[in-house]
């Protein structure tokens, strides 16, 4: 079984008014794929000697991001989670979307925005960079698809 996430990739940046506190790959569809992978790997590892109980699966992201450091971070995180990233397109001269989670002085969540407090810049584009048809080898009735509205 293949579980495929489809959409534009986003880097989530956690920060307060003066510094970045953490970064991680974001966007709901990618988070779902990442968590499904972890859950199924944990499930399979609980059946060490009983191959018949294991679930045969592959998780894949079919998506797009900029050819920049934010895209590098996201892809590295996905690959470290054993997710197939070979269907991610890197766009030159495009910045990967970034979403900012603002924290108070105690690191409690305040709000989220598309604009960076510090630089006052926004790295968000209106329409999806994901263009074209889904590759035929990813199309099957047996697959599960997780979409991001583009």
Which stretches of residues belong to each language-model region?
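Short catalytic helix/loop segments, enriched in acidic residues and glycine
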Residues: 19-38
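Generic helix-packing signal
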Residues: 9, 37-40
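A general structural signal for well-ordered alpha-helical segments in protein cores
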Residues: 3, 29-33, 71
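Gly/Ser/Thr-rich beta-alpha loop segments that engage phosphate groups in nucleotides
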Residues: 9, 27-28, 65-68
